């Protein structure tokens, strides 16, 4: 077969064509309306965000057709036929081509993976991005049904047994893929005398977030914004988790709350209800665009049915009764969207619903998560984050649970104490606990994911395509049994006084679950060894224990198969009589029931199957008839086995709540073991003492993340002493790179780890309970929002001021540096003064390079303390400026020099430039300090009363 010519040559040929409408560029351009399908959303809206690589392909087709040549040319295997310029009329379509067109019209937003025999093929315009992404051969042909350059559609293909491997690559690149499977076999067609094309149907549709087979646990969020109210619902299809939230009625607060919501959950898909309020809200649009990694789509709500029409009455009533109108609108939108993926049954388990923000947990705004690098560092990875430091979980459900614990620290003193006591208990040896930990480790080594397996069972049991294998189900039940058996065996040991109350309650609940025979009853119905058979069909046929739990349909087909096999053996006796030779059946190339004879000596009515130079293999007429009947009943047997398995899954799903309780407890124990590992594997960790007062007092504390990244012996420990009674506001100065930011982050992480329930990296600690940590750190603009560095800084300060409580921990880093020196000093002074005198009295750490702010300690000696990060100046004979050695120790007092020249030297700036800068700095230093002190003195003199101070603050806040 000729491979055709390179696409570049095809484009050159097309330029010589008399009719530009028939050129390759024209055909690709004509195809452009269909190419919006390669995102899971339409690209008619400017606000839609799609995968950059996919968007490039779409745009190249849509706007600059010739550029697609360079896009496809990247794959050396991609070719286009040499008759690209042909103007011949289209021939009559093949039935398969027409089937593709019909399916494409029904699913225009999907790339179709169509099963044809033992391959999955991508036809027409779908083949263009698929061949490029997978780097596979592109077979030339028509791209759309309007084309007439070839007899058939272009295509590329992948083996059916590797479909899901390739699917992951396509989904990662932003495609939405519909899998079209052959839903009837050749054997059944022949037995039932079916004619015509094989029946094919869309059996699954996937996007990155809805691909739960090998998914990464992505979230899908739906947001409804009605102008006066806003709400969101987020689902995690691979676990069944549903997270709901209603936001403030005032727009600024609602946007801030939505930003925090999205920062915590980091959805890969965001669906926005498309209404007038949404269209008119530019701030909402800009906020959503700032989440660049998420696919954003706008869906009209008037096309969605009410929730009462989408769910069973009792479940719909639960949502309507317990949730707001905006929340139920989001649920209806998500049910409609997920129905295409056969995942809409996620909402039939109301026990999986949870509120995002409750008064039981510390509030961590999005800026705090980002600044403190809780889950993601500045490079976008996990290493070097607080979660990375704490995560020693063994199981996947334990890891997800720990993420919740870290994102939602406790604020109830008793609950925190329970976790701390549990960790202390786990650090003391107990044989029963040791055995239980071994089981959890084994579950982790097996890479089992109980939550994912259970939700896959739920989807399949409620009408979705089969998403779970028999082996996965049996392994899940066996692991459940290992937990239950261990708890039952050691139930008296788990009541030991050395085990904390929290652990005792967990093991007590497990013992209660172990007392029911659910797991053993389910396992008694199957043959465990069957799932380890190599052939999938053997697994299916031998899965059930038919002696103890008979299935009439399966038994009927097995009897029919047995009779046919006996008939075939009886026929063999007759064959031996006919040919008068001691022959036996043989199997060659998966073709059974063959009779091999030398040469071509078989009877003429025998069907010749295969031959070699010396042997011919036959299937006699009656054997052929019996074999076809056997194949038919074998197919029917598999159908019966699949139906019985579906019933079995429904029985498991009927105990969903029971298994969810079991999974939750095991995940929580895994989390406690993880915190124990953090607390005990590091030297110098101690159990904090909880205080009812707002305070953090820690002896020789360290930044846990930095210490973990470096050698413990190299880390410099510091005391922390900040409290409501004294030193409520710390003003911290010091040289650049001297450790100021690391220190204030350390304070925040100490507070967080305490309320997560973990031991702390210090010799001893007394810590109060905070309801929120508010952080303003870093210098960056926000181009998408049209905000300068200073605007971002002021906006974040404004949010902090509005969010303050009397239990807040506030961290502000170099406020005022985004503007001129005079304005910067004035704003920094006014904001810190506001926090000092604010009746809500938050604990505050304020980093600054304005040494003139030191006067605030003089005016508020009880509340304010000046500190700096220690250093040493080292004079050098060959340079005018001193070198600086950082000591990283926190000391009392103020530093008037930031030692920026030392940073310039470390960065490799030439010495002659630094020398000149030093001379200029020395000349300016005194003038600036005099000016700052004069300005500060004037401000202090003008503050004759608290009223005048509030006027100043009001001016600053209004400016913000």
Swiss-Prot record:
Region (Mispair-binding domain): 87-209
GO cellular component, one term: MutSbeta complex
UniProt record, GO biological process: gene conversion at mating-type locus; maintenance of DNA repeat elements; meiotic mismatch repair; reciprocal meiotic recombination; removal of nonhomologous ends; replication fork arrest
Major place of residence: nucleus
Region (Disordered) residue spans: 1-35, 53-93
Regions of compositional bias (Basic and acidic residues) in chain numbering: 18-28, 56-65
The keyword DNA repair is assigned to this record: yes
InterPro entries: DNA_mismatch_repair_MutS-lik_N, DNA_mismatch_repair_MutS/MSH, DNA_mismatch_repair_MutS_C, DNA_mismatch_repair_MutS_core, DNA_mismatch_repair_MutS_N, DNA_mismatch_repair_MutS_sf, DNA_mmatch_repair_MutS_con_dom, MutS
UniProt superkingdom: Eukaryota
Membrane spanning stretches: none
Residues at which ATP binds: 734-741
Annotated keywords: ATP-binding, DNA damage, DNA repair, DNA-binding, Nucleotide-binding, Nucleus
Role summary: Component of the post-replicative DNA mismatch repair system (MMR). Heterodimerizes with MSH2 to form MutS beta, which binds to DNA mismatches thereby initiating DNA repair. MSH3 provides substrate-binding and substrate specificity to the complex. When bound, the MutS beta heterodimer bends the DNA helix and shields approximately 20 base pairs. Acts mainly to repair insertion-deletion loops (IDLs) from 2 to 13 nucleotides in size, but can also repair base-base and single insertion-deletion mismatches that occur during replication.
Family note: Belongs to the DNA mismatch repair MutS family. MSH3 subfamily.
Protein name: DNA mismatch repair protein MSH3
Organism: Meyerozyma guilliermondii (strain ATCC 6260 / CBS 566 / DSM 6381 / JCM 1539 / NBRC 10279 / NRRL Y-324) (Yeast)
């Amino acid at each position: 077969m000729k491979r055709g010519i390179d696409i570049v040559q095809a484009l050159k040929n097309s330029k010589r064509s008399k009719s530009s409408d028939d050129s390759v560029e024209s055909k690709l351009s004509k195809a452009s309306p269909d190419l919006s399908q390669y995102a899971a959303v339409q690209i008619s809206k400017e606000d839609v965000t799609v995968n950059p690589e996919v968007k490039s392909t779409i745009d190249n087709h849509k706007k600059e057709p010739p550029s697609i040549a360079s896009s496809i040319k990247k794959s050396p295997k991609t070719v286009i036929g040499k008759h690209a310029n042909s103007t011949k009329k289209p021939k009559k379509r093949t039935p398969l081509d027409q089937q593709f067109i019909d399916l494409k019209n029904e699913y225009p937003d999907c790339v179709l993976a169509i099963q044809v025999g033992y391959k999955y093929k991508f036809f027409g315009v779908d083949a263009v991005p698929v061949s490029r992404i997978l780097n596979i051969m592109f077979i030339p042909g028509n791209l759309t049904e309007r084309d007439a350059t070839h007899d058939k559609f272009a295509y590329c293909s992948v083996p059916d047994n590797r479909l899901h491997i390739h699917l992951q690559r396509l989904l990662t690149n932003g495609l939405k893929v519909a899998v079209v499977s052959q839903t009837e076999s050749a054997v059944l067609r022949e037995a039932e005398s079916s004619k015509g094309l094989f029946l094919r149907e869309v059996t699954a549709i996937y996007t990155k977030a809805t691909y739960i087979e090998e998914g990464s646990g992505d979230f899908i969020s739906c947001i409804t914004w009605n102008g006066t109210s806003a709400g969101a619902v987020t689902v995690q299809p691979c676990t069944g988790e549903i997270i709901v939230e209603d936001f403030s009625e005032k727009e600024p607060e609602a946007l801030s709350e939505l930003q925090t919501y999205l920062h915590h959950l980091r959805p890969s898909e965001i669906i926005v209800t498309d209404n007038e309020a949404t269209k008119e809200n530019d701030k909402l649009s800009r906020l959503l665009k700032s989440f660049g990694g998420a696919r954003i789509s706008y869906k009209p709500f008037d096309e969605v049915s009410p929730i009462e029409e989408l769910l069973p009455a009792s479940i719909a009533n639960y949502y309507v009764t317990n949730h707001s109108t905006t929340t139920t609108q989001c649920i209806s939108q998500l049910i409609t969207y997920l129905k295409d993926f056969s995942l809409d049954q996620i909402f039939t388990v109301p026990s999986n619903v949870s509120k995002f923000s409750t008064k039981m947990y510390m509030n961590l705004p999005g800026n705090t998560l980002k600044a403190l690098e809780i889950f993601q560092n500045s490079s976008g990875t996990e290493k070097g984050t607080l979660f990375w430091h704490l995560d020693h979980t063994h199981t996947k459900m334990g890891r997800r649970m720990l993420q919740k614990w870290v994102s939602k620290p406790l604020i109830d003193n008793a609950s925190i104490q329970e976790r701390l006591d549990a960790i202390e208990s786990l650090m003391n040896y107990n044989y029963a606990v040791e055995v239980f930990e071994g089981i959890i480790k084994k579950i982790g080594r097996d890479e089992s994911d109980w939550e994912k397996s259970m939700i896959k069972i739920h989807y399949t049991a409620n009408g979705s395509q089969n998403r779970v294998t028999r082996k996965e189900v049996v392994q899940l039940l066996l692991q459940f049994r290992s937990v239950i058996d261990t708890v039952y065996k050691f139930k008296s040991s788990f009541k030991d006084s050395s085990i904390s109350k929290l652990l005792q309650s967990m093991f007590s609940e497990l013992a209660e679950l172990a007392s029911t025979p659910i797991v053993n009853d389910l396992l008694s119905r199957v043959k465990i060894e069957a799932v380890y058979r190599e052939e999938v069909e053997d697994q299916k046929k031998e899965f059930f224990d038919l002696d103890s739990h008979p299935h009439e349909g399966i038994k009927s087909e097995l009897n029919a198969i047995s009779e046919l096999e006996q008939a075939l053996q009886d026929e063999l006796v007759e064959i031996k009589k006919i040919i008068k030779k001691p022959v036996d059946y043989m199997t060659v190339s998966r073709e059974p029931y063959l009779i091999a004879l030398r040469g071509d000596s078989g009877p003429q009515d025998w069907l010749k199957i295969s031959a070699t130079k010396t042997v011919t293999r036959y299937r006699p007429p009656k054997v052929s008839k019996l074999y076809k009947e056997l194949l038919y009943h074998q197919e029917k047997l598999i159908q019966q086995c699949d139906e019985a398995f579906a019933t079995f899954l429904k029985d498991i799903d009927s105990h969903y709540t029971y298994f969810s309780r079991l999974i939750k407890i095991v995940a929580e124990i895994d989390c406690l073991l993880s915190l124990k590992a953090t607390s005990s594997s590091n030297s110098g960790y101690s159990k904090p003492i909880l205080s009812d007062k707002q305070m953090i007092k820690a002896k020789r504390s360290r930044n846990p993340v930095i210490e973990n990244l470096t050698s413990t012996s190299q880390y410099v420990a510091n005391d922390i002493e900040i409290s409501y009674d004294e030193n409520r506001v710390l003003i911290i100065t010091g040289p650049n790179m001297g450790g100021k930011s690391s220190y204030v982050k350390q304070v925040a992480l100490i507070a967080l780890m305490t309320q997560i329930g973990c031991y702390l990296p210090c010799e001893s600690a007394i810590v109060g309970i905070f309801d929120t940590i508010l952080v303003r750190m870093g210098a960056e603009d926000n181009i998408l929002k049209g905000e300068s560095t200073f605007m971002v800084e002021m906006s974040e300060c404004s949010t902090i001021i509005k969010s303050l409580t009397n239990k807040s921990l506030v961290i502000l880093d170099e406020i005022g540096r985004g503007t001129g020196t005079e304005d910067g000093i004035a704003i920094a002074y006014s904001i810190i003064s506001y926090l000092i005198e604010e009746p809500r009295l938050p604990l505050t750490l304020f980093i600054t390079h304005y040494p003139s702010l030191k006067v605030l300690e003089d005016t508020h000696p009880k509340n304010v303390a000046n500190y700096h990060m220690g250093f040493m100046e080292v004079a050098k004979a060959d340079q005018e400026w001193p070198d600086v050695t950082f000591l990283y120790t926190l000391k009392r007092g103020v530093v008037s020099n930031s030692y920026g020249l030392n940073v310039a030297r470390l960065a490799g700036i030439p010495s002659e430039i630094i020398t000149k800068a030093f001379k200029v700095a020395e000349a300016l230093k005194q003038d600036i300090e005099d000016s700052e002190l004069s300005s500060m003195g004037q401000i202090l003199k003008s503050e004759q009363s608290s009223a005048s101070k509030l006027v100043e603050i009001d001016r600053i806040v209004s400016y913000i």
